[in-house]
């Protein structure tokens, strides 16, 4: 189903954006596993945050202080609905340690993808 947008037709969501906040040291393994699962392309951002893990205490020049935001990595991938389950299962399996602080996965509908260089849209732009 398509609806008219500004210069492009906007399709109803058939693609999903997966954002996963994971531990730094799990990044390479997750990247390799997603590549094997036929997920192509990834954006990686250094982020800081906290959840149930909260912060931790550190010593600096003899003084103790609390670090509220912990360093993590956020990976973003866009997949078709047919690859969604495999991609999410892969991230869960590879990034999980079983400890607090393993991270979160967020899944959102993606209305459109446009390749800037060619103007291709949808799956062909991925």
Question: Where do the model's predicted regions map?
Answer:
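Positively charged, small/polar-rich N-terminal and surface patches that mediate targeting and assembly
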Residues: 2-126
């Amino acid at each position: 189903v398509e609806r008219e947008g500004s210069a492009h037709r906007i399709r109803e969501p058939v693609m999903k954006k997966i954002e996963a906040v994971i531990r730094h040291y799990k990044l390479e393994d997750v990247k390799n596993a997603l590549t094997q699962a036929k997920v192509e392309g990834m954006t990686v951002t250094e982020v800081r945050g906290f959840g149930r893990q909260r912060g931790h205490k550190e010593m600096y020049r003899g003084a103790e202080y609390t670090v509220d935001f912990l360093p993590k990595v956020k990976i973003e991938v866009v997949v078709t609905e047919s690859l969604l389950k495999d991609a999410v299962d892969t991230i869960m399996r590879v990034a999980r340690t079983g400890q607090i602080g393993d991270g979160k996965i967020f899944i959102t509908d993606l209305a459109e993808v446009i390749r800037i260089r060619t103007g291709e849209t949808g799956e062909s732009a991925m």
